[in-house]
């Protein structure tokens, strides 16, 4: 398999939005080819966090991660942050070469900030570039609002990645059309 042009998609769920304070509680990855065809779905890992960390989550995170069942999966998880990083890297190395794929997803800079602090080996696996679907979303909302993609965010990492890939496919078909 030619790994050079594969795209690595990632999503994290966190205890909050502060990359210097909050923790990762779920990680998922998907690998696509350059045409956005899914090649493989990586492990979806709930990352154990102790009760004092979970208790610090704000009401929004408590509500959404509680309703999805993620908080309970975090409590029951046998994976710490380093183990989740190692398992994710082991999966990705089968489909991409270090430094080749941009990090892909929605609002991916936020995920990258968390990876930089908490999973630095995984963050270093990616090219320095980002493929951030939310940038395209913001431009489409302003320039082509009739083509805006509406999605139901589940705040479950794997489904959020699938939705991001679907969103980019949508924009590819409607905005990034072949000019010839």
UniProtKB/Swiss-Prot annotation:
Domain named Exonuclease: residues: 7-168
Keywords of this entry: Cytoplasm, Exonuclease, Hydrolase, Nuclease
A GO cellular-component term linked to this record: cytoplasm
Protein name listed in UniProt: Oligoribonuclease
Keyword Cytoplasm belongs to the record: yes
Pfam families according to UniProt: RNase_T
Entries under NCBIfam families matching the protein: PRK05359.1 (NF003765)
GO molecular function terms listed in the Swiss-Prot or TrEMBL record: 3'-5'-RNA exonuclease activity; nucleic acid binding
GO biological process, one term: DNA metabolic process
Described function: 3'-to-5' exoribonuclease specific for small oligoribonucleotides.
Active site as annotated: 128
Keyword Zinc: no
